[in-house]
């Protein structure tokens, strides 16, 4: 007779645990909510979560260690260098082959984001239903510009660092081709999205169908309250970073198109000497922060 007993605590142990990378740099205030959100988004799922604590000078590591005692499958990976790109590289090239090789799907998340109910299942289904796609992305369900951001991501078939997934075979290719994100790069998700659409060959035109945005897969994050001066300065810095992101990508795009994926610099600042060729473009109010970004990139070389 067949054993029709439900598995203990609702788990289907035949399913491989889902690997999740979480980037965390000084996230002691948000990391528990982030981790909690995964478990409540996918009740009954087993996870293999790796919190990539990079350059933390706060209590992030202590918080994660305590959390891992009470929750199966939560692992702290402690990295001295505070750089999100380096932490991503460590996950893909060191953690995956050793700890979670040959999985069908890998999830990636920021330590200050929260996954909405069913978000990971939606992305897994997105990849299953679109065998041609290398990646499935979640969309924001909060934030001031949420409506615009969602529309843009659906139109451009975009991916943002807050929450996305990569097909296992694509991760294998990243490992095989030794693809590493440049250190100090601002737009890690922008570059990754481009590499996915290029199918790791920047000589080819972009193929938008390589990314599946999943409207039912959502994430939330804390917005800046507009009340205190410290938030204004944080917002200003964020706008400068957005400016830098565009300029870095301009330098990188040119180089990759002409020299191929092997031309990815180990550190994005290697390309800063060419920032003298970049032109300041009018962008309304953001022209000012763009100008600041450009000055900083040029000053870096002096």
Where are the regions that the model predicts?
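A conserved acidic beta->alpha catalytic loop
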Residues: 37, 53-63, 81, 113-114
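Short beta-strand-to-loop acidic/aromatic patch adjacent to the donor-nucleotide binding site
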Residues: 100-114
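Acidic helix N-cap motif at the loop->helix transition within catalytic regions
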Residues: 30-32, 58-67, 78, 118
């Amino acid at each position: 007779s067949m054993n029709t007993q439900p598995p203990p605590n609702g788990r289907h142990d035949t399913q491989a645990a889902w690997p999740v990378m979480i980037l965390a740099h000084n996230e002691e205030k948000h990391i528990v909510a982030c981790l909690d959100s995964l478990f409540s988004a996918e009740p009954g799922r087993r996870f293999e979560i790796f919190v990539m604590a990079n350059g933390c000078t706060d209590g992030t590591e202590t918080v994660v260690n305590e959390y891992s005692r009470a929750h199966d499958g939560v692992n702290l990976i402690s990295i001295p260098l505070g750089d999100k790109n380096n932490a991503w590289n460590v996950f893909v090239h060191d953690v995956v082959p050793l700890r979670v090789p040959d999985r069908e799907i890998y999830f990636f998340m920021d330590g200050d984001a929260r996954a909405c109910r069913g978000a990971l299942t939606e992305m897994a289904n997105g990849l299953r239903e679109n065998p041609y796609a290398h990646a499935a992305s979640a969309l924001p369900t909060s934030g001031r510009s949420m409506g615009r951001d969602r529309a843009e991501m659906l139109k451009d078939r975009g991916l943002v660092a807050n929450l996305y997934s990569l097909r296992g075979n694509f991760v294998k290719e990243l490992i095989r081709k030794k693809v590493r994100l440049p250190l100090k790069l601002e737009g890690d998700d922008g570059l990754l999205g481009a590499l996915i659409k290029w199918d790791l060959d920047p000589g080819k035109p972009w193929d938008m169908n390589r990314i599946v945005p999943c409207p039912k897969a959502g994430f939330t994050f804390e917005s800046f309250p507009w009340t205190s001066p410290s938030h204004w300065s944080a917002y200003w810095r964020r706008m400068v970073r957005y400016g830098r992101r565009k300029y870095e990508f301009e330098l990188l795009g040119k180089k990759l198109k002409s020299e191929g994926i092997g031309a990815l610099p180990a550190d994005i600042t290697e390309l800063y000497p060419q920032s003298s060729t970049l032109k300041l473009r009018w962008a309304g109010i953001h022209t000012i922060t763009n100008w600041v970004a450009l000055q900083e990139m040029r000053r870096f070389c002096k």
